[in-house]
Structure formats: C-alpha cells, structure tokens
C-alpha cells in the first residue's frame, strides 16, 4: 500500500512526532511505500536546523532527515505554519531580508497542495 503521514506535533514535548517516525519505519520494513510526510501546525518544528537535543536524547530532527536520504521520502512542511513559527529556507530568508535560514536539509517548504496531492494519490493518510 501507498501511505502518507501528517505530523502535527513538535519534535519534543509530545509523542506525536516520534510515534510518526516509528510508524514510518514500520511501514517501510513491511514493504509498504511511504510517499511523503507532511508537517503541519506545531509539526513544523521537526524541520528546525537549530534544534539541539542533549547528547543522551534521540535527535528526531536528524532522524527525519535520515529517513529522507535513505528512503527518498518527501518531507514537506507547511510554508504558512513554518513562517509563523520562524522556520525558513534560504529563499524566504532572502525575500524577508532575514540574516539566515534554519530549515533542516531534506525538508521542503510546501503549500497545503502537497497534502491534498498525497490524499489523492495515496491509499492511506495517517495523522499523528
């Protein structure tokens, strides 16, 4: 089956994002296709390059990035939610005349159209 995941919880503070990542790995291990992960609302914090967990904590942001590089899973974050929460890429930093970007490599700023497309092209969309 072809799946998409929507994550609405931050990298730290709730179980949503870590549960979503575990579910993503379970899907791939069972031979399913994971087309994309869409980060919405507080979920956009999973794409913050500046997140720096303690050395004895799991680095969820880099784990998502690893999912992208190893399995080619698209990591889309809602551009409106991201900008409201201070998550920006180089293009937006330039447009807004900000000194730098903080979007973790592997993530892409996207509109809700990416979520709509996933809903239309996947067999299941699972929200965390």
From Swiss-Prot:
Active site: 78
The protein's Enzyme Commission number: 2.8.1.-
Location of the protein in the cell: Cytoplasm
Principal location class: cytoplasm
A Pfam family this chain is assigned to: DsrE
GO BP of this protein: tRNA wobble position uridine thiolation
Single GO cellular component term: sulfurtransferase complex
Disulfide cross-links: none
UniProt key word Transferase: yes
This protein's UniProt keywords: Cytoplasm, Transferase, tRNA processing
Molecular functions per Gene Ontology: sulfur carrier activity; sulfurtransferase activity
The UniProt record lists the keyword DNA-binding: no
InterPro entries tied to this protein: DsrEFH-like (IPR027396), Sulphur_relay_DsrE/F-like (IPR003787), Sulphur_relay_TusD/DsrE (IPR017463)
Subunit relationships: Heterohexamer, formed by a dimer of trimers. The hexameric TusBCD complex contains 2 copies each of TusB, TusC and TusD. The TusBCD complex interacts with TusE.
Family stated for the protein in its record: Belongs to the DsrE/TusD family.
NCBIfam families in the cross-refs: PRK00207.1, sulf_tusD_dsrE
Function: Part of a sulfur-relay system required for 2-thiolation of 5-methylaminomethyl-2-thiouridine (mnm(5)s(2)U) at tRNA wobble positions. Accepts sulfur from TusA and transfers it in turn to TusE.
Name of the protein this chain belongs to: Sulfurtransferase TusD
